[in-house]
């Protein structure tokens, strides 16, 4: 006799091992010629183009050499009053 409220334990399936050659092909296909259609990404891209934000990790214009330790470029200081 089994109880009406008793549940059987779920069977756990093991994933097959991932090969290195499978990963090499998959990494290249993740963002291959696909336009990101997220509203957040659109706003972020507009801010980058306006110059009010640094290039993001997802931006295609990012070179990878940008760091927080870079010194600001020499130029007149911006005033908050005008």
UniProtKB/Swiss-Prot annotation:
Region (Disordered): 1-33, 49-82
Location of the motif Nuclear localization signal: 10-18
Compartment(s) of residence: Nucleus; Cytoplasm; Secreted, Extracellular space
GO cellular component labels: cytoplasm; extracellular region; nucleoplasm; nucleus
Keyword GTP-binding: no
Sites of Phosphoserine modification: 2
Tissues of expression: Expression in skeletal muscle is reduced during limb unloading but increases during the active recovery phase that follows.
Annotated InterPro entries: MUSTN1
Segments passing through the bilayer: none
Source taxon at top rank: Eukaryota
Record keyword Phosphoprotein present: yes
Primary localization: nucleus
One GO BP annotation of this record: chondrocyte differentiation
Keywords, alphabetical: Chondrogenesis, Cytoplasm, Myogenesis, Nucleus, Phosphoprotein, Secreted
UniProt similarity note: Belongs to the MUSTN1 family.
Job of this protein: Required for chondrocyte development and proliferation. Plays a role in myoblast differentiation and fusion. Modulates skeletal muscle extracellular matrix composition. Plays a role in skeletal muscle function. Plays a role in glucose homeostasis.
Protein name per Swiss-Prot or TrEMBL: Musculoskeletal embryonic nuclear protein 1
Organism field: Homo sapiens
Gene that specifies this protein: MUSTN1
